[in-house]
């Protein structure tokens, strides 16, 4: 996969303010506010910044946390996990492997088979429905 690199100004021009704030400045959308929180549509979730395929709807589950949750990313290297020590916490940030967009965080409290919960901001995603 080829890395996609742009300046912050270039990202700012192509993203709406909410997308830019979360994806490029590592913000977080308010819980239960995202368009994909309750979505049950079958398909593949892509990065809003670079269109890289990230998560399949078959791994999405209702965690009750207020953000779309998945128990695994797509096979391969769709996402990268990065140690995050911001806000006085130690967490694992999830970023797009292609463009380094901040997507959310992963926690060790998910369902089988992985036991992981990828807690992802809706604003970072674009769902491509299955036909």
Swiss-Prot record:
Protein name per its UniProtKB record: Peptide methionine sulfoxide reductase MsrB
Gene Ontology MF terms in the entry: peptide-methionine (R)-S-oxide reductase activity; zinc ion binding
Organism: Pseudomonas syringae pv. tomato (strain ATCC BAA-871 / DC3000)
Cofactor, free-text remark: Binds 1 zinc ion per subunit. The zinc ion is important for the structural integrity of the protein.
Active site: 119
InterPro entries: Met_Sox_Rdtase_MsrB (IPR028427), Met_Sox_Rdtase_MsrB_dom (IPR002579), Mss4-like_sf (IPR011057)
Homology family: Belongs to the MsrB Met sulfoxide reductase family.
Keyword Chaperone set for record: no
UniProt-annotated binding residues for Zn(2+): 47, 50, 96, 99
Cofactor: Zn(2+)
Domain (MsrB): residue spans on this chain: 8-130
Lineage, broadest ranks: Bacteria, Pseudomonadati, Pseudomonadota, Gammaproteobacteria, Pseudomonadales
Alphabetic keyword roster: Metal-binding, Oxidoreductase, Zinc
Cellular component annotations (GO), alphabetically ordered: cytoplasm
One biological process term in Gene Ontology: response to oxidative stress
UniProt-listed Enzyme Commission number(s): 1.8.4.12
